[in-house]
Amino acid sequence: MSDWVYGFFMAWGMFLAIPCPKKIWRESARRKMLACLPLVGCVVGGVWVLCACLAQWLPGPLAAALLAAAPWLVTGFLHLDGFMDVCDAVLSRRDLETRRRILKDSHCGAFAVICMVLLAMGQWSAFLSARSLSLWGLALIPVASRSCAALAVLTLRPLDSSQYSAMQRGGGPVWFAAVCLALSAVLPLLLAGSFAPAMTAVGCALAAWYGYRQLDGMSGDVSGFALTVGELWGVLTLAVWR
């Protein structure tokens, strides 16, 4: 069986709360697993669009709550964990060694809680204030964010403590993720005039670079932080523009 097939099902099993139809693992397919993150984003985007269709029958605040929580629920809150860990580490404003130690600490600090509350408020408010949603834009926001996050992990120098520290960089997986990123940014613009996925990619890239600089390395937590921030940028773009 191809490493790409293994990579897809590995990505599904690791990054989605939806039960994986085929639980398989091959260590040599780890890079392909990251490259398949955009395909996982297609699943998340599909669920998000279904929720948007259902939300039309709900009162505004409930509809906004459903849409805000949908991408978190379908991923089992996995990326929020990285978002909160990075917020705790970076906002401590301590030296590099201490920031890295806080990143690995399993306890939840005040900075993480505050940032999570602000994130939830921002995402809920964006959906509540949106007069209409581009379904193409909504569907491809998770694809753009995961393409960008995959590129960051596959190309940037990892933290020594990262599970991806021994992984080879470059190659086919990088090109696959880059093509997915380009398509997810351009297609909704051409088909529906939506800038949301493109802005998602911009937000994700900036957040990944910020986390990388602050912690002097890339990790799964930094990737989750960047993905979460990027999706917020995309949702805000949907609300205020299209």
What annotation goes with each model-predicted range?
Residues M1-W25:
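Membrane-proximal soluble regions of multi-pass membrane proteins
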